[in-house]
From Swiss-Prot:
Transmembrane portions of the chain: 437-457
Protein name (Swiss-Prot/TrEMBL): UDP-glycosyltransferase
Membrane topology: Single-pass membrane protein
Family: Belongs to the glycosyltransferase 28 family.
Glycosylation-annotated residues: N350
CDD domains, A to Z: GT1_Gtf-like (cd03784)
Organism superkingdom: Eukaryota
Biotechnology: Stromemycin was found to show antibacterial activity against methicillin-resistant Staphylococcus aureus (MRSA) as well as significant protein tyrosine phosphatase 1B (PTP1B) inhibitory activity. Moreover, related O-glycosides show also significant anti-HIV activity or alpha-glucosidase inhibitory activity, as well as moderate cytotoxic activity against cancer cells and thus are promising candidates for drug discovery projects.
Keyword entries, A-Z: Glycoprotein, Glycosyltransferase, Membrane, Transferase, Transmembrane, Transmembrane helix
Length: 462
């Protein structure tokens, strides 16, 4: 994929919108581009594992590399898949409305009205209708490879490692093969000593907002205009006194920005001076040691797209978030941060500069102290959970032992494979048996027979 193709793909994600039919279709068009690499991935993996000299004992994959699931099923190689959030269709709970991770408003039914819950269920139908072409596209690819459909399981038959934790995620019961292991972060991070100008900026300012939208989000000129205007309003009101912005491709937006707001060096805001690092209140860098910045005491806020890593780092380092998610799991992360009381979620398509400035003011002043308490609360929970990455390594080792010794005897001869030791037995039963429906039918019959006899006696003898 070329750089331009990569940008075009993520622009397509940015243009998607769950609130409109065309926007929902745009999401699945972008996903079709992602999954168009599935045949190549599948063929290369199949060639690799078919060679005894290179056949792996275990596969660790990302959720988008779903060809690994087909390889697992075909070659019986144990698998672990990494997810940035709880998988959408696995381990569903009745108190989690709609499509988990893709809800419009409510993450759980606790504070949702009946109308809200109906709206979430209707949204699921809208998504299913929008993904029609996507489903047909996947089916055709799989047929060409000689594979049938692979419906998503309610419970996994492989190890699922979720880089998140309860407190951010809605708590729910999980099968043994699903493990929250987040936040997965390195024990150390690059210090700010390697960026002396940035370190000096953070030392001479007391209330800095850190702005970063990741490496893939394309910022259109109108959004940059509103962001800068809102940040300048917050600076002028004294809510913040500095802005650090990690933005590597800002030069490309200058011409678009000029057509958006007119001559950018005129008026109250000198956009050119800001983007060219000539405004001493702003420090715009192409790359930033993010964790080192978030760890600085002068950084009081984080304006973020809420990617998986950014969300975990913000929570771990205890920085409240002005959330402006763009696509995918970012949208759910924005809602989660707001629900946890550590941030304010904003709509990337409809926000105003005034709204941004007001939200910055709300978080900085924190009149009730609730944001500070929740930030500290969630930071401590995240710190405790960050040790669970070692549990993930232990569980991988455990699954490898089970796979190695469940299909051969002491002489190394193949025998009937034992069921996966962490898989609950209901996954290998019919739906009727797993839910005891046959047992309930027997109970009903046993109850119905004596009742029928009593009724017959009363009708014919009494």
């Amino acid at each position: 994929m070329t750089v331009e193709e990569d940008k075009a793909l993520y622009r397509l994600f940015d243009e998607s919108d769950a609130s409109t039919a065309e926007g929902r279709k745009g999401t699945f068009r972008a996903l079709m581009k992602f999954h168009s690499w599935w045949p190549e991935t599948y063929q290369n993996l199949k060639a690799l594992v078919s060679d005894p000299a290179h056949r792996p004992n275990f596969i660790l994959a990302d959720l988008l590399a779903d060809a690994c699931i087909d390889i697992m099923n075909e070659f019986e190689i144990p698998l672990a898949v990494h997810y940035p959030q709880m998988p959408i269709q696995m381990a569903p709970q009745k108190y989690i409305p709609g499509m988990p991770g893709a809800q419009l408003k409510h993450l759980s039914s606790e504070h949702a009205s009946l109308w809200d819950r109906l709206r979430e269920e209707y949204h699921v139908l809208q998504l299913i209708f929008a993904m029609k072409d996507y489903i047909l596209f996947q089916r055709k690819m799989r047929q060409e490879m000689g594979l049938g459909p692979r419906p998503p399981p309610r419970k996994p038959d492989y190890l699922v490692l979720v880089n998140s934790f309860f407190g951010l995620e809605v708590p729910k019961d999980l099968p043994p093969l699903m493990i929250p292991i987040g936040p997965v972060l390195a024990d150390t991070f690059q210090p700010l000593d390697t960026a002396p100008e940035l370190l000096h900026f953070l030392h001479v300012h007391r209330r800095v907002i850190y702005v970063a939208f990741g490496s893939h989000v394309e910022l259109p000129a109108w959004r940059v205009h509103r962001l800068i205007k809102g940040l300048c309003q917050a600076l002028e009101s004294g809510d913040i006194d500095g802005v650090v912005w990690a933005w590597k491709d800002r030069a490309s937006v200058l011409k678009e920005l000029e057509s958006e707001v007119g001559p950018i060096a005129k008026g109250n805001i000198d956009y050119y001076a800001i983007l060219d690092n000539k405004d001493e209140r702003f420090k715009i860098v192409g790359w930033a040691p993010q964790r080192a910045i978030l760890d600085q005491p002068s950084v009081c806020l984080y304006l973020s797209h809420c990617g998986a890593s950014s969300t975990m780092e913000a929570v771990y380092h205890g920085v409240p978030v002005v959330a402006m998610p763009v696509y995918g799991d970012q949208l759910a992360n924005g809602k989660r941060l707001e629900a946890a009381g550590v941030g304010i979620n904003m709509d990337r398509k409809n926000f105003t500069a005034e709204e941004l400035s007001t939200n910055i003011q709300t978080l900085v002043h924190d009149k009730q102290g609730s944001f500070a308490r929740n930030v500290l609360r969630l930071q401590r929970i995240a710190s405790a959970n960050s040790r669970r990455k070692h549990v993930a390594a232990d569980r991988i080792e455990e699954v490898m032992y089970d796979a190695e010794l469940s299909s051969s005897d002491r002489a190394g001869k193949d025998v009937a494979r034992r069921p996966m030791h962490l898989q609950t037995p209901d996954c290998r039963m019919s739906w009727v048996k797993a839910n005891n429906l046959d047992l309930y039918l027997v109970y009903i019959a046993l109850l119905a027979v004596p009742l029928g006899v009593v009724r017959w006696i009363s009708k014919n003898w009494l």
